[in-house]
Amino acid sequence: MQESGYVPLKIADPALLFAELGRQPLPGMSLEEMADLMADLGEPRFRAKQLFQWVYQKGVKDFDAMTNLPARLRQHLAGTTMLRLLEKETEQHDRRTGTTKYLFRLADGSQVESVLMRQSWGNSVCVTTQVGCRMGCTFCASTVGGLVRNLTAGEIVDQIVMMQRELPQGERISTVVLMGSGEPLENYDHVLKAVRLVHDPEGLNIGYRHITISTSGIVPGMRRLAEEGLPITLALSLHAPTDELRRQLMPVARIWPLAEVLAAAREYGEKTGRRVTYEYILIEGVNDGPEEARQLARLLKGALAHVNLIPMNPVAERPQYRRPGPERVNRFKEILESNGIATTVRREMGGEIDAACGQLRNRAQRKHMGR
């Protein structure tokens, strides 16, 4: 059912891009699809599992590395398929936090950002689901320039595979968050296929409970995801405790009021048994005061909830918004916790990289345009 005022995203399927290139992308194919490919080539079914592992688990960049495949098959695949869908353009390191941000180029020349965070408990990655974004959140760099296109499931998964390759031998990615540029629930089919591929034991083998999907509050998508029966963590970008303020910050709030968004979030928690994470960006003088904290506490009272506070990262394209000082951040957190709301403050990426999502891509585009 179409919600009043909401026009579902209607753009060409990104998979058509590869049809135009005349090569079939291997990233994005399920084990069953690879089995069909092998059958079409007259190969035994077990070759599909071998190929699947080379593409996802081992992440090789050259068909010659697939040593357990016959030379004739490797040669055929090299001429008719694409093994990797991304090319690393640049990277930024923050030595203090062990965070690396990557800028990848896609087959059509588009660029996307991904982040690898190395931590004591494991390695996590933040990946992008769209080139650009049409949500129009006023504090976000990703929306500058609007939406270009959806990513395919293969392009989403390949970000993870490429970052897995960057880790020392013996280390692996343990947590995936789909919280980069774009609205994942507007690219639902490709995102869900990517999640299933990431989970596959023959591939990256990352448990559903270690995968998070973020949304700005696309209510039909939230309800649909709840019906999937997957124990994925849902992260809802809330960012304001009232409809009036949320509409100012997030155009999507003009379609679904807070009551409807929160009802969908509670439904998700009830159906999956997973605690919903509420993302809340703190903007100095806009939504970071004690009254906003008390309003947020009342809003989430009794819900299976965890609030993740995100002090505003500087965004060149959004100079009107500033980051609050530590005292205001801590005061906001204390008010929530005193009301029984589990709350954390997001770990800093650090000042050595463009921390805000979308910054690296925007800078590269400005450089390309000579600005």
Curated annotation (Swiss-Prot):
Disulfide bond positions: C126-C357
What broad class describes the main subcellular location of this protein? Answer: cytoplasm
Q: Which UniProt keywords apply?
A: 4Fe-4S, Cytoplasm, Disulfide bond, Iron, Iron-sulfur, Metal-binding, Methyltransferase, rRNA processing, S-adenosyl-L-methionine, Transferase, tRNA processing
- The residues that hold S-adenosyl-L-methionine are G182, E183, S214, S237, L238, H239, N313
Q: Which GO terms describe its molecular function?
A: 4 iron, 4 sulfur cluster binding; metal ion binding; rRNA (adenine(2503)-C2-)-methyltransferase activity; rRNA binding; tRNA (adenine(37)-C2)-methyltransferase activity; tRNA binding
Compartment(s) of residence? Cytoplasm
- Co-factor binding details: Binds 1 [4Fe-4S] cluster. The cluster is coordinated with 3 cysteines and an exchangeable S-adenosyl-L-methionine.
Q: Does the keyword Acetylation apply?
A: no
Instruction: List GO BP terms, alphabetically.
Output: rRNA base methylation; tRNA methylation
State which Enzyme Commission number(s) the record gives.
Answer: 2.1.1.192
Catalytic residues at E113, C357
Q: Quick check: keyword S-adenosyl-L-methionine in the entry? A: yes
One Pfam family name is RlmN_N
Main enzyme class: transferase
Q: Which GO terms describe its cellular component?
A: cytoplasm
List of residues binding [4Fe-4S] cluster: C133, C137, C140
Report which reactions are catalysed by this protein.
adenosine(2503) in 23S rRNA + 2 reduced [2Fe-2S]-[ferredoxin] + 2 S-adenosyl-L-methionine = 2-methyladenosine(2503) in 23S rRNA + 5'-deoxyadenosine + L-methionine + 2 oxidized [2Fe-2S]-[ferredoxin] + S-adenosyl-L-homocysteine; adenosine(37) in tRNA + 2 reduced [2Fe-2S]-[ferredoxin] + 2 S-adenosyl-L-methionine = 2-methyladenosine(37) in tRNA + 5'-deoxyadenosine + L-methionine + 2 oxidized [2Fe-2S]-[ferredoxin] + S-adenosyl-L-homocysteine
Cofactor(s) recorded for this entry are: [4Fe-4S] cluster
* Residue ranges occupied by any Radical SAM core domain in the UniProt entry: 119-352
Family, as annotated: Belongs to the radical SAM superfamily. RlmN family.
Protein purpose: Specifically methylates position 2 of adenine 2503 in 23S rRNA and position 2 of adenine 37 in tRNAs.
Q: Which NCBIfam families match?
A: rRNA_mod_RlmN
Instruction: Note the HAMAP family from the entry.
Output: RNA_methyltr_RlmN (MF_01849)
Q: What else is known?
A: Reaction proceeds by a ping-pong mechanism involving intermediate methylation of a conserved cysteine residue.
Protein name (database record): Probable dual-specificity RNA methyltransferase RlmN
Q: Which gene name belongs to this protein?
A: rlmN
